[in-house]
Amino acid sequence: MTFSFNLSDELKSTLLVLAKKDKPLADAINKKIRQIIDSDAIDHYKNLRHDLNNYKRVHIRKSFVLLFKVNKKDNHILFDRFGHHDDIYT
């Protein structure tokens, strides 16, 4: 099942900066986004808890995390934030 998706403004600006400074990381993020929207097992991705309980997360490389929200009713994913795992949850 393929999901429709949007990128938050924050994530768009992060990707623009990374495309210039760290192209392999930007490519890894784009590859992971394509993998997620084409995934049949969207529940495979870890749900977060507490204040971020409506988000799921996926690791990119070892130290970075991409947060996203899934709306199964509308078959839509909002990719919201990307950052280092020490900073992303604040």
Summary of predicted features, one role per range:
Residues R34-V58:
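A short, surface-exposed loop/turn module that caps and links secondary-structure elements
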Residues K20, N30, I37-D38:
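Alpha-helix boundary recognition
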Residues K12, R49, Y89:
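Nucleotide phosphate-binding site architecture
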Residues L7-L11:
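Basic, amphipathic "hinge/linker" alpha-helix immediately C-terminal to the N-terminal HTH DNA-binding motif
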Residues T2-S4, L16-A26, I42, I60-T90:
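Enriched for short, Lys/Arg-rich terminal
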